[in-house]
Amino acid sequence: MEMRRMTARNGESLAFSAAGLGTGPLGDFFELLDEKTAISTVEQGLASGVRVFDSSPHYGNGLAESRMGAGLRRAQRDQIVVSSKIGRIMDPFGKKPEVRKDVVSPGFAGGFPHAPRFDYSYDGAMRSIEHSLLRIGLDRLDIVLIHDCDVWTHGRDDAGPRFKEAMAGAYVALDKLRREKVVKAIGFGINEAGTCVKFARAGDFDVAMMAGRYSLLDQTGLQEFLPLASEKGMGVMLAGVFNSGILATGSIPGAKFDYAVAPEAIMTRVKEIEEVCRRHHVTIRQAALQFAIAHPAVVSVVLGAVTPDEVKANVHDASVEMPASLWSDLKTANLLNSAAPTAG
């Protein structure tokens, strides 16, 4: 698999596989997953050439980190990039909060019986990293991201104060760890292109993970954030490139777009993209993945999986050669931003 390299602000070098493994689904995302399958999924990633493994305390309240660590136990540490996030502290004695109706809240069916508590402070970041290392079973992380500090997660009233808390607290902590080379790189993991811009301008970050805002269906990240990331020399890890499902499944009944049933306008657009893909003998899933990989600011596309076979499919689709005429036909049909960089 293609490898992409970048150098962090502290001089540390990182090598990314074009396709990474996102471990959110291993935290019992939407459905329970047995331990053996979860660990085998991570092990298959290693065997298939995946070298980027991303997690978060949020995923199953720490369960995904634990499973990822078990799957990486025999990995050669200097040949993989391990990423996790801060912003939530897991309390084994706390009450789980009620789901708020004013924010998007994709559900976990299982996970550890711990209560998450938002904390973007200096001490909270340090504590979160310590807890993550214990769950994963490592003595260091390569990348640490400020997680979900956006309107998507906190609602409009709380997003601003949370941003200020993160920049005054967590960012200072992460910058200290980076300067001391305890971590190689620091960044943020956000669901909104505008908030990515806000963070990129506010701090001196190495990497960013943007979810769902650069895909075949949503190219809002192309307008300002991706050019800004290139200008600042940031590596971009893309997540959510299938927009939570529909670009992987195609226009099947009940297909999901951004964690909800896709509206008719999205279904129609997907059907039109599928037709162009059929003419070029590729799947919409392959096109969605290859489109994301093609942007020069992107160092890795992080893909979820719940079985070893899904990992194999991800790696295969990340390596399929796309005909240049596919992209030109999509642009001619106004199904793709004409300014979007493409390969082939």
Predicted regions and their residues:
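Beta/alpha (TIM)-barrel catalytic core signal, keyed to glycine-rich beta->alpha loops juxtaposed to Asp/Glu
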Residues: 4-5, 37, 149-344
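Conserved residues at the C-terminal ends of beta-strands
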Residues: 22, 32, 56, 144-147, ...
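Short, well-ordered coil/turn segments that N-cap beta-strands
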Residues: 15-19, 49-51, 76-80, 138-142, ...
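Active-site groove signature of glycoside hydrolases
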Residues: 133-156
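Short, flexible, mixed-charge acidic loops at enzyme active sites
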Residues: 94-107, 251-255
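N-terminal binding-site loop/beta-alpha segment at the start of enzyme catalytic domains
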Residues: 1-101
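An active-site-proximal structural segment forming one wall of the substrate-binding cleft
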Residues: 119-140
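Active-site mouth loops of central-metabolism enzymes
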Residues: 24-36, 110-126
